[in-house]
């Protein structure tokens, strides 16, 4: 009699192990919806966590999405968030359903077909063992591994390639982009190039700057001349560049102190860097600007807004956490494509992304903001602050809307957002950097590129209007504070339902609550 419970317990463990084996085998098959790494069978179809969550949310609120094109948008890992209508239709066409049967109830024919596909995927992986592989986080991954996998960094290695799911990043002149902690790896060739009728080359003199007691452009609020900041212009002065000076809490001015022994930067190289950053940005935009503009008349009705307001706090937080995580994944892809970023050590890549990813998302949000009626694009339509009332953090939402409103007043071009967000991300003042010199070099290159582009387009005036760094930090701090309050109220929801990457970046508690199995 005493052995019966033991046999039942052993049988349960064996059944659990068998199910786990089946699940791990299934995960070798990519998501049927977008091609990302799958995490098992969800609603009857092999999908990734992202598509599973998207389908669950669409069914909860009986969402009625619309397509701005011809209802045939491609759905893959990089485009899946651009058209919710086509994504949902693909989910339904492939058989996703709330009433779908589970794996254990599949027919023999279905199981045999699934087994054959698993074997096919395993064979393909064996053939590709000699090729570079970009890892993706396993379902439920937590801690630093999540961001490491998202970056595509194998343990102990630092590949320089980009994700295979995105177009290849364009190459830039190695002289300008090499980030070396020691030695003059920067291009030493003097180049003369025409810009708005002016012919010039830039020279930086660290010794001259130190002799005059200046730390950087960030250390003074007064206007600086080329002589004061260590720039030398030959033949003609570059219009505007030498006169740009901002306060210590601004992204607007070059921190020339940061450059190593790197005397010269040709305008040709700077222009190439501008083009590279803008291309990387275009390839990693979550939503196309033309689609956002086309949807501005598509506003949530009063009934739809009421529906959002009646949602529980935890459901609304979960929704926003998933949307924010998707946006951050695009920022990670953007970072990987910034020339020189993947040459940084793994620690510094993670430090920069943990500190700057949310800030970049906040800047990018201004594209999805309509200043005419103070609404933002969310889940297929535009809505105001009242849409997010269920979150219980009206002050944070109001601050974010105000920030987007102030940025939209600058009328950023897409290229300006690209260069500005690159500077927001590559910030050598982030605490915890191991090779600060390399980050300073990258930051300096991007500062030159940003200023070059603004001078070329006669937009130098926006530098004085850029929000201070402290504003972005304040918004991020408010977000973390509100998350901590929510996490205190609903620890199990955060642990079980929030994306691992979101928890790694923002949550202060990574331990599972008592009684919650991993």
Curated annotation (Swiss-Prot):
<dbReference type="GO" id="GO:0000978">
    <property type="term" value="F:RNA polymerase II cis-regulatory region sequence-specific DNA binding"/>
</dbReference>
<keyword id="KW-0090">Biological rhythms</keyword>
<feature type="short sequence motif" description="AF-2">
    <location>
        <begin position="501"/>
        <end position="506"/>
    </location>
</feature>
<keyword id="KW-0479">Metal-binding</keyword>
<dbReference type="InterPro" id="IPR044101">
    <property type="entry name" value="NR_DBD_ROR"/>
</dbReference>
<dbReference type="GO" id="GO:0000785">
    <property type="term" value="C:chromatin"/>
</dbReference>
<keyword id="KW-0805">Transcription regulation</keyword>
<feature type="zinc finger region" description="NR C4-type">
    <location>
        <begin position="31"/>
        <end position="51"/>
    </location>
</feature>
<dbReference type="GO" id="GO:0048535">
    <property type="term" value="P:lymph node development"/>
</dbReference>
<dbReference type="GO" id="GO:0098531">
    <property type="term" value="F:ligand-modulated transcription factor activity"/>
</dbReference>
<dbReference type="GO" id="GO:0048541">
    <property type="term" value="P:Peyer's patch development"/>
</dbReference>
<comment type="subunit">
    <text>Interacts (via AF-2 motif) with the coactivator NCOA2 (via LXXLL motif). Interacts with the corepressor NCOR1. Interacts with CRY1. Interacts (via AF-2 motif) with the coactivators NCOA1 and PPARGC1A (via LXXLL motif). Interacts (via AF-2 motif) with PROX1. Interacts with FOXP3. Interacts with NR0B2.</text>
</comment>
<dbReference type="GO" id="GO:0042753">
    <property type="term" value="P:positive regulation of circadian rhythm"/>
</dbReference>
<dbReference type="GO" id="GO:0019218">
    <property type="term" value="P:regulation of steroid metabolic process"/>
</dbReference>
<dbReference type="Pfam" id="PF00105">
    <property type="entry name" value="zf-C4"/>
</dbReference>
<dbReference type="InterPro" id="IPR001628">
    <property type="entry name" value="Znf_hrmn_rcpt"/>
</dbReference>
<dbReference type="GO" id="GO:1990837">
    <property type="term" value="F:sequence-specific double-stranded DNA binding"/>
</dbReference>
<keyword id="KW-0675">Receptor</keyword>
<dbReference type="GO" id="GO:0001227">
    <property type="term" value="F:DNA-binding transcription repressor activity, RNA polymerase II-specific"/>
</dbReference>
<protein>
    <recommendedName>
        <fullName>Nuclear receptor ROR-gamma</fullName>
    </recommendedName>
</protein>
<comment type="function">
    <text>Nuclear receptor that binds DNA as a monomer to ROR response elements (RORE) containing a single core motif half-site 5'-AGGTCA-3' preceded by a short A-T-rich sequence. Key regulator of cellular differentiation, immunity, peripheral circadian rhythm as well as lipid, steroid, xenobiotics and glucose metabolism. Considered to have intrinsic transcriptional activity, have some natural ligands like oxysterols that act as agonists (25-hydroxycholesterol) or inverse agonists (7-oxygenated sterols), enhancing or repressing the transcriptional activity, respectively.</text>
</comment>
<keyword id="KW-0862">Zinc</keyword>
<dbReference type="GO" id="GO:0070244">
    <property type="term" value="P:negative regulation of thymocyte apoptotic process"/>
</dbReference>
<dbReference type="InterPro" id="IPR000536">
    <property type="entry name" value="Nucl_hrmn_rcpt_lig-bd"/>
</dbReference>
<feature type="region of interest" description="Disordered">
    <location>
        <begin position="105"/>
        <end position="183"/>
    </location>
</feature>
<dbReference type="GO" id="GO:0008142">
    <property type="term" value="F:oxysterol binding"/>
</dbReference>
<dbReference type="GO" id="GO:0004879">
    <property type="term" value="F:nuclear receptor activity"/>
</dbReference>
<dbReference type="GO" id="GO:0005654">
    <property type="term" value="C:nucleoplasm"/>
</dbReference>
<dbReference type="InterPro" id="IPR003079">
    <property type="entry name" value="ROR_rcpt"/>
</dbReference>
<feature type="DNA-binding region" description="Nuclear receptor">
    <location>
        <begin position="31"/>
        <end position="96"/>
    </location>
</feature>
<dbReference type="GO" id="GO:0045598">
    <property type="term" value="P:regulation of fat cell differentiation"/>
</dbReference>
<keyword id="KW-0010">Activator</keyword>
<dbReference type="GO" id="GO:0072539">
    <property type="term" value="P:T-helper 17 cell differentiation"/>
</dbReference>
<feature type="compositionally biased region" description="Low complexity">
    <location>
        <begin position="119"/>
        <end position="130"/>
    </location>
</feature>
<keyword id="KW-0238">DNA-binding</keyword>
<keyword id="KW-0804">Transcription</keyword>
<dbReference type="GO" id="GO:0003700">
    <property type="term" value="F:DNA-binding transcription factor activity"/>
</dbReference>
<dbReference type="GO" id="GO:0036315">
    <property type="term" value="P:cellular response to sterol"/>
</dbReference>
<dbReference type="InterPro" id="IPR013088">
    <property type="entry name" value="Znf_NHR/GATA"/>
</dbReference>
<dbReference type="InterPro" id="IPR001723">
    <property type="entry name" value="Nuclear_hrmn_rcpt"/>
</dbReference>
<feature type="region of interest" description="Modulating">
    <location>
        <begin position="1"/>
        <end position="30"/>
    </location>
</feature>
<dbReference type="GO" id="GO:0032922">
    <property type="term" value="P:circadian regulation of gene expression"/>
</dbReference>
